[in-house]
């Protein structure tokens, strides 16, 4: 019996999302043949959607919970609850322009275009983020005040400032300069694609990763809230497994205080007596990077690590 509707992303986040859910204990089948795959939990129905659409769909309640990039949550100004950073799908939204342009920042680009009385053309998939970024620029505010840049899409045109034009891109944004655009606002992982197209990054608008997000009304429904938090709990386990390690060791009674002094103070180890007289088993979960630092010290007082 369905309790919640779960939206999973198609595209760049797709494979990593299925792997993540597999690590969380879920099995999803049929995703290559249908947009409504089967999950091994009859209380969850899954639908595959574009990550750009998921935040708004969750806000409007057609889906209860889902995964999308934080960039699309902000771009859509979606009124949703961000439950958990899933720590994958890490990207940056950047401002880039041709290597031939000597400008080192957006203010310089804008200032040059103003001096030369030339329209600044921006291509991007992120219309709202681009508009906000441009209008927050000090050079822009000084010259144009609160005038909104001209925004052009196939469906509508808005804005009053024709000196700065923001054009919607359907993709392959890095191919637009210099003929169709002077500047692009684009998403990158490593920046290699920009480099191959003779473009350089001059600013980072935001960093983004995959997030588990939920509908506010769904979280007020007792049954849905409980199921959403079940999903959240399993997702937390996967995220924490990346950054933490569960350690087990055998310790002589007279060395226990030494070991407890080495283990990070915020952790609460489990200590149980072993059948061998005078020996104890100690286990705890600690941050992975801290484990690497304390391992040499632990080996002086413990065995079986």
Which residues are covered by each model-predicted region?
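Small-molecule-sensing regulatory modules
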Residues: 1-43, 48, 67-81, 85-90, ...
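Short, structured active-site "lid" loops
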Residues: 43-62
